[in-house]
Amino acid sequence: MANYTAADVKKLREMTGSGMMDCKKALVEAEGDFDKAIEILRIQGAKDVGKRAERSASEGLIAVSGNTMIEVNAETDFVAKNQEFIDFANKVAQAADAANANSREELEAVEVDGVKAVDALQELSAKIGEKLELKRAVTLEGDKVAVYLHQRSADLPPAVGVLVAYEGENEEAARAAAMQVAALKASFLSTDDIPAETVAKEREIAEATAREEGKPEKALPNIIEGRLKGYFKDVVLLEQPSVTESKKTVKQVMDEAGVKLTGFVRYELGQA
């Protein structure tokens, strides 16, 4: 005869976050001793962390606090939308912002409720039963930063996050620029930010492609410049057609709004 009740199992699940069958097994092993059952589950959870370390964690969320953005990963979207996981990520983001965290190492070192984030993460991993990972963090310099977070579906936390640093008073225009980055994935703010070797390589590709197409020699310079401009429109934020006013570039829209963009960063869940 079982020396525990359904209420005991329910209470143990609520206290530890462990699965129902794990709670039942722990109560059986502990012969109904509640405190001992908790200890058994904690030990088992710690053992399982090592096994989980080999598994892939590609779900999760993007969280933002102030000028800082972080990515925290889990194995499944079921855990990604777990409120405890979301609350943990938001707490870490706040701590990362206070510390101006700018790398994975700095992110892991921030403290949450008096505990290093990486240690708090392992405790949560043992409780939830999935591999969790503090993947990356960035702090964008600037007195003013516009934020845009995009959810892939209404029941999931943000999977894309953008920070845009700007000067000026039009926050709405700056946020529109952040939405632009989320949608069109610009790689550079201006053409001046593109490395010279990258421009040279694109020029080589444009010329080689034009020659393969049999374009007239005299027309090559104009064709190459035209294709370079097309490349810039794809990868340079200020050169892209605005998603809000398609006949204007982002630079034109920002100039009209009295906004100067000074930097941006884009995170997408599961990408480097």
From Swiss-Prot:
GO terms for cellular component: cytoplasm. SUPFAM superfamilies: Elongation factor Ts (EF-Ts), dimerisation domain, UBA-like. PANTHER family: ELONGATION FACTOR TS, ELONGATION FACTOR TS, MITOCHONDRIAL. It is found in: Cytoplasm. Signal peptide: none annotated. Keywords: Cytoplasm, Elongation factor, Protein biosynthesis. It holds the Pfam family EF_TS. This is Elongation factor Ts. The keyword Aminoacyl-tRNA synthetase does not apply. Its main location: cytoplasm. Residues 76-79 are annotated as: Involved in Mg(2+) ion dislocation from EF-Tu. One of its GO terms (molecular function) is translation elongation factor activity. InterPro entries: EF-Ts_dimer_sf, Transl_elong_EFTs/EF1B, Transl_elong_EFTs/EF1B_dimer, Transl_elong_Ts_CS, UBA-like_sf. It comes from Corynebacterium urealyticum (strain ATCC 43042 / DSM 7109).
